[in-house]
């Protein structure tokens, strides 16, 4: 990713909920990431999403923290906070608890906000909590890389 971001002269900020910092960890494990990586935050709770990212309480109440609307808002807000070219956001239910019939364990929303708008994808990952979080982090980075190309 470093070569893609460097070539494009672009910057990145990340807001992670269910992945708990895994995306930022993967990015910062590569020397030279400071050339493009501006911010990584983990607003895990609804209160943190409101306080850190200024996600509307009405949006959280209407759609829930695990929703397309919240993922999109997170990606847009984290991008704006540090004036990054790109913002990635992840929100989901890694389990084993916290699920409902409508929102099962493994449901994850990934959003990428960039210069040309926002894309959001819904995924259903299977496996342990660790596996769901790992798959979500990988999918989020893949989504960004596809958008960069």
What does each of the following model-derived ranges do?
Residues 1-149:
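Short alpha-helical segments enriched in small residues
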